[in-house]
Amino acid sequence: MLIIELLKAIFFGIIEGITEWLPVSSTGHLILVQEFIRLNQDKAFIEMFNIIIQLGAIIAVMLIYFERLNPFQPGKTAREVQLTWQLWLKVVIACIPSILIAVPLDNWFEAHFYFMVPIAIALIVYGIAFIWIEKQNAQQEPAVTDLARMSYKTAFFIGCFQVLSIVPGTSRSGATILGAIILGTSRTVAADFTFFLAIPTMFGYSGLKAVKFFLDGHHLDFAQVLILLVASLTAFVVSLLAIRFLTDYVKKHDFTIFGKYRIVLGSLLLIYSFFKFVF
């Protein structure tokens, strides 16, 4: 029944909207949830669905930060316009590693890593990394506390960290936030740049998935279009709340709690995978 599929789409949209911006891996969570709750659709559609619904989350970022990211915003001074263009150039530079490395390798990683055990291991490894990095930085003041002071070189290396998210369970936001902190930015700068970097990265990735879907001879019927729209709209609404939460959270707290969450979830998944294999 279509109504059941739409309810599932809403549920998946909620998962996407929450986990896309928290450093816990949205794709990993969607794959995990679909182990128990699946759309009654073919594999090709589900793989495309997991990526396309990220567009709702991206539109939420564009809405929240529209004035800041718009170089043509009325009332901006010449200096503010210059800084906006410089920010976009940093974002473009940070996309280069993904274009050169992640895009060519995407199909291979999708074929070999999109199942439970690699996701669980990635959750645990990066959970440990978050806790360790936060402990190392506890007594250190960040060198970069404003995006305007972040160098193009730093932006490029943050983009290199983003490539790590090609492994499901890593988290794109987690990899870039972790990388930015290692490179000396404050948590606020790390979170903001992660939001901005997501716009071209995820638009591009979603576009590639959509093109591949149609080039492979697939098509969308009315029900599938409706499922995509409902899930994306839900992800958009939930993302508005999740982004606000994270931007407020990082002003007062570190990312240790997310590291602990990742370790617990990853461990439970390994146990689940073991019993599933045995029984």
Swiss-Prot record:
EC assignment: 3.6.1.27
Source superkingdom: Bacteria
Keywords: Antibiotic resistance, Cell membrane, Cell shape, Cell wall biogenesis/degradation, Hydrolase, Membrane, Peptidoglycan synthesis, Transmembrane, Transmembrane helix
Topology of the protein relative to the lipid bilayer: Multi-pass membrane protein
BP GO annotations: cell wall organization; peptidoglycan biosynthetic process; regulation of cell shape; response to antibiotic
InterPro entries in the record: UppP
Keyword DNA damage annotated: no
Membrane spanning stretches: 2-22, 44-64, 85-105, 113-133, 163-183, 188-208, 223-243, 255-275
Disulphide bonds in the chain: none
GO cellular component terms given for this protein: plasma membrane
Pfam families listed in its UniProt record: BacA
One GO MF term: undecaprenyl-diphosphatase activity
Catalytic activity: di-trans,octa-cis-undecaprenyl diphosphate + H2O = di-trans,octa-cis-undecaprenyl phosphate + phosphate + H(+)
Annotated localization: Cell membrane
Location, primary (coarse class): membrane
HAMAP family (UniProt xref): Undec_diphosphatase
Function: Catalyzes the dephosphorylation of undecaprenyl diphosphate (UPP). Confers resistance to bacitracin.
Protein family: Belongs to the UppP family.
Note: Bacitracin is thought to be involved in the inhibition of peptidoglycan synthesis by sequestering undecaprenyl diphosphate, thereby reducing the pool of lipid carrier available.
Protein name, entry field: Undecaprenyl-diphosphatase
